[in-house]
C-alpha cells in the first residue's frame, strides 16, 4: 500500500471536501483559513488515505495488442531467456515483468492486464446457463480428449497444462489452472455478478471485469479489434469476437460435436453447446407469453422470439439518412449489405463471393448440398422465418368459412375423448387434413404446401405428435398405380413393419366413400398394425408426389365419410 496526501476543506455547513493543489510546491497549512470562489470561508485539514496497489497473480495470463498471449510476473522469472522478458509500468506506477512464450520485437506493448483473459467464452455462456444433459455430454467429451492426448512437459519435468482446481458444484467438475479462474467460474453457479455498468439507465451486471469492459463498448461504440482480411472492414469489441469472425474466412471449426456418429463441428463453443441440445432434447428457454409457450435451445433465439410479442426493435442502422430498426442484431447485420458493395466471403467450391456468411451458407446448401452452420446464418434463417410468420399474422384476412368432412374416428384406450381425422377445406382455399377432437378443442393440421417440403417422408399425425417415416428407395417401382408393399425406415434408422401402399386406380372405386369426397383422387397407405394414412391427390400422378402430401393417421377398418350440415 502507498500513501497519498490530499488537502481537505471543511465547509461552513460541516461537510468535508477535497482540493487539489493548483501550484506545484505550494503548501496549505493545517487549520489555514481560505476563501472559496463563492465567497464562503473554509478551513484546511490534512488527512492520509490508503490507495491499493494494482494486484495480480504471479504468472497471470495477459493479452498483447497483436492478440498473442503472455504471462505477467512481479519479478523476473528465473531461467527465462532475457530476450523473452519485457519490463512494463502498470497504472499504479509499479513495475512488472512480461514473459513471452516466444521472443517478440522490443516495441510490443501490453494492451491490458486482463484478470479474466481468455474467459470471454465463459462470460457468453453464463448468459445462457448450462443444462445437466449438455454439461454431461461436453464433460464426457472433454475427459476423453484429455485422456487420449499425450501430456507435454517442460524442462523441469513439471507437467504443462495440468489443471489442479476442480469445480465442486454437483454435475459440473470443470478444471482450472488457478484458484482465481475457478472463483470466476463459480459465479456461473452462484449468480454473483460484482461488476456493474454505471451508464445511465443501464445497470447490467457481469461476472467478470472483462465482461463489463466488453459491454461498456456497446455504449461507447469502440471496436478496437479489426479483421486482418484485406477485403473485410469489420471490427469487434473483443479479441474473442475477432477470433470467432476470422474463422469465417479460414473455415476453421475447432469445436466438434461429442455425440458419436454426428461429426459436425462449429466455429464457436456456444454454437456447439446449442447444437448439443438437438441431441439431448433440452429446451431451457420457454416463451412466457400466454397461449404461446414455445421452447428454445438458445437464449438468443428466445430473446428474438419474445420481441415478436413485444414489438421491441432495439437495433438501429447508424448509416446517415437510414435509421431503420430491427428486432435482432442479425437483421441489422444483414441490412448493412445495402450500404456496402464489399463481398469478402468466398465459396470454396465454385469461387463465388458474397457479402454475408448467411448467404454464403445458403448458397452452399442449395448449390453444393453442403450443410454448414454459422451463428450469423442460423440466426438470419431463424429471423427470416419469424418475420415471415409475424408478417403473415398481421396481413392475414379475416378467417374464411371452413367446411369439415370427417373421414374416420380414432379412439385410444388412454383417452376418453375420441379423435377424428378430418379433411378441412376453407372457402376458395386448398384442402387440409387435420386430427380434431369431437369437441373441437385440439387440432393438428398440415397444408399441401407444408407437406411438399417433406419430399419422400410420411408424417403420421397422432394425438402425441408426429412420427416421420422415409421411403427406402422404391420410388421407381412404386410410381405406377396398384398395390405395393415396402418396408419403411424410421428416423433413427430402424426398420418398421411392412406398409401396403394403395395408389390411385381400380382399388379406389367410384362408389368408395373416400373417392366421393369432392370426386378427387385419394390413395391409402395401410400398415400391418392397422394404421392407415390418407393421401389426397390433386394434380400428383406418382406415389412420390402423393406421399409428399401424406396427412393423417387413421384407425384400421373401413373409412367412413361423415358430412357436415354445409354439405361438404
Curated annotation (Swiss-Prot):
Subcellular location: Nucleus
Bias (Low complexity) ranges: 379-395
Coiled-coil annotated residue ranges, if any: none
Repeat among keywords: yes
Keywords from the named record: DNA-binding, Isopeptide bond, Metal-binding, Nucleus, Repeat, Transcription, Transcription regulation, Ubl conjugation, Zinc, Zinc-finger
Domain of life: Eukaryota
GO molecular function, one term: zinc ion binding
Family (UniProt): Belongs to the krueppel C2H2-type zinc-finger protein family.
Protein name listed in UniProt: Zinc finger protein 76
Source species: Mus musculus (Mouse)
Amino acid at each position: 500500500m502507498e500513501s497519498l496526501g490530499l488537502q481537505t476543506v471543511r465547509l461552513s455547513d460541516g461537510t468535508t471536501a477535497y482540493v487539489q493543489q493548483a501550484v506545484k510546491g505550494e503548501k496549505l497549512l493545517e487549520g489555514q483559513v481560505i476563501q472559496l470562489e463563492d465567497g464562503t470561508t473554509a478551513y484546511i485539514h490534512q488527512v492520509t488515505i490508503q490507495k491499493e496497489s494494482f494486484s495480480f497473480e504471479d504468472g497471470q495470463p495477459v493479452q498483447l495488442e497483436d492478440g498473442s498471449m503472455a504471462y505477467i510476473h512481479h519479478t523476473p522469472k528465473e531461467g527465462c531467456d532475457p530476450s523473452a522478458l519485457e519490463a512494463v509500468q502498470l497504472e499504479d506506477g509499479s513495475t512488472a515483468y512480461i514473459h513471452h512464450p516466444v521472443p517478440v520485437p522490443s516495441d510490443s506493448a501490453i494492451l491490458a492486464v486482463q484478470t479474466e483473459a481468455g474467459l470471454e467464452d465463459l462470460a457468453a455462456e453464463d448468459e445462457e446457463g448450462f443444462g445437466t444433459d449438455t454439461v454431461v455430454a461436453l464433460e464426457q467429451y472433454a475427459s476423453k480428449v484429455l485422456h487420449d492426448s499425450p501430456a507435454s512437459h517442460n524442462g523441469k519435468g513439471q507437467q504443462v497444462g495440468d489443471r489442479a482446481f476442480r469445480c465442486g458444484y454437483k454435475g459440473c467438475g470443470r478444471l482450472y489452472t488457478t484458484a482465481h479462474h475457478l472463483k470466476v467460474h463459480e459465479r456461473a453457479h452462484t449468480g454473483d455478478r460484482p461488476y456493474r455498468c454505471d451508464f445511465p439507465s443501464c445497470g447490467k451486471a457481469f461476472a467478470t471485469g472483462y465482461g463489463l469492459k466488453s459491454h461498456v463498448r456497446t455504449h461507447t461504440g469502440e471496436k478496437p479489434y479489426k479483421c486482418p482480411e484485406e477485403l473485410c472492414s469489420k471490427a469487434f469489441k473483443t479479441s474473442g469476437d475477432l477470433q470467432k469472425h476470422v474463422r469465417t474466412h479460414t473455415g476453421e471449426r475447432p469445436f466438434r460435436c461429442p455425440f458419436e456418429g454426428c461429426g459436425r463441428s462449429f466455429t464457436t463453443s456456444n454454437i456447439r453447446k446449442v447444437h448439443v441440445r438437438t441431441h439431448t432434447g433440452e429446451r431451457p428457454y420457454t416463451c412466457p407469453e400466454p397461449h404461446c409457450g414455445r421452447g428454445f435451445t438458445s437464449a438468443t433465439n428466445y430473446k428474438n422470439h419474445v420481441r415478436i410479442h413485444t414489438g421491441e426493435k432495439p437495433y438501429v442502422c447508424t448509416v446517415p439518412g437510414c435509421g431503420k430498426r430491427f428486432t435482432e442484431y442479425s437483421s441489422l447485420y444483414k441490412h448493412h449489405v445495402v450500404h456496402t458493395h464489399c463481398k469478402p466471403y468466398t465459396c470454396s467450391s465454385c469461387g463465388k463471393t458474397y457479402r454475408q456468411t448467411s448467404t454464403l451458407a445458403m448458397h452452399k446448401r442449395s448449390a453444393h448440398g453442403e450443410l454448414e452452420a454459422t451463428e450469423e446464418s442460423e440466426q438470419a434463417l431463424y429471423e427470416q422465418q419469424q418475420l415471415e410468420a409475424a408478417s403473415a399474422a398481421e396481413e392475414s384476412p379475416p378467417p374464411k368459412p371452413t367446411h369439415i368432412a370427417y373421414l374416420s374416428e380414432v379412439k385410444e384406450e388412454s383417452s376418453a375423448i375420441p379423435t377424428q381425422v378430418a379433411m378441412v377445406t376453407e372457402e376458395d382455399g386448398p384442402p387440409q387434413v387435420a386430427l380434431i377432437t369431437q369437441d373441437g378443442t385440439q387440432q393438428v393440421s398440415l397444408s399441401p404446401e407444408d407437406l411438399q417440403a417433406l419430399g419422400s417422408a410420411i408424417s403420421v399425425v397422432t394425438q402425441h405428435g408426429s412420427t416421420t417415416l422415409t421411403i427406402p428407395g422404391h420410388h421407381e417401382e412404386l410410381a405406377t398405380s396398384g398395390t405395393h408393399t415396402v418396408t419403411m425406415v424410421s428416423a433413427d434408422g430402424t426398420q418398421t413393419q411392412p406398409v401396403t401402399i394403395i395408389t390411385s386406380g381400380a382399388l379406389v372405386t367410384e362408389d368408395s366413400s373416400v373417392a366421393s369426397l369432392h370426386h378427387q383422387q385419394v390413395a391409402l397407405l395401410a400398415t400391418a398394425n392397422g394404421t392407415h394414412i390418407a393421401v389426397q391427390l390433386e394434380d400428383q400422378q406418382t406415389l412420390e408426389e402423393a406421399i409428399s402430401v401424406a396427412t393423417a393417421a387413421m384407425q384400421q377398418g373401413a373409412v367412413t365419410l361423415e358430412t357436415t350440415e354445409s354439405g361438404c
